[in-house]
Amino acid sequence: MCDKDLLYIEDAHNQKLYYRFTPAAVVSNFIPLVVVLDNEKKAHSSDFEYKMWNILTPVYTHGDENKELLQKLIKQIAQEHECEDHIYVYGSSTGGYEAILQGILSKANAVFAHTPPIRLLDTNSTQSDLTNLLNPTDSFPIFYLCGNESNPEDDTAYFADACKKNGIKVHLDFCPKSDEDENHRLKEVLNFFERVASQN
């Protein structure tokens, strides 16, 4: 990585996970953390300041090799900024899969996933089907899913059905405008998360 603005976290085997972190523009006792998980190109362009959120944008490769580092990073940032109980996760496409996975593992308040694949094919991932992580006894984030409107049988509907069977809150009623640029879509999602946080 040649981007001098990127920070990184490293494990005992010198595996590095690069990321950007932008603290909220205002100082307050209640500043949640939002983790933005998207593909590498979008992660590079999503470095913007948002008044009421701490923004963590990992630049990562998908797969098991970075899962533990990403969990460590989320925990570390949340502790440093005293927002362990106020974590929100957003991702689109493959980043939507990661958002659901990391939201579950970090016990986030809410996850927004835009057209996420739920069942991964041709992968060595131990979480090849995210519905296997659901159960009726553990606590889970509230899931806000936006699927493919042209394909009602997509993975989003499959995951939503599994959530409902396990008594987990899931909503399919909010989709940002897909024709907008990524930063605009993210701001739309953050405004939505603000409304969700104010209701809790």
Regions found by a protein language model. Give the residues of each.
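Alpha/beta-hydrolase active-site loop
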Residues: 62-82
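The feature captures the conserved acid-bearing segment of alpha/beta-hydrolase catalytic domains
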Residues: 121-199
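Glycine-rich nucleophile elbow surrounding the catalytic serine of serine-hydrolase chemistry
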Residues: 91-101
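Short, surface-exposed basic-aromatic patches at helix termini and helix-loop junctions that form
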Residues: 49-50, 76-80, 102-109, 160-165
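Alpha/beta-hydrolase fold nucleophile elbow
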Residues: 82-93
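Structural motif
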Residues: 36-40, 60, 92, 145-150
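Short, surface-exposed "cap/lid" segments of acyl-processing enzymes
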Residues: 2-53, 59-60, 64
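A conserved short beta-strand
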Residues: 107-122
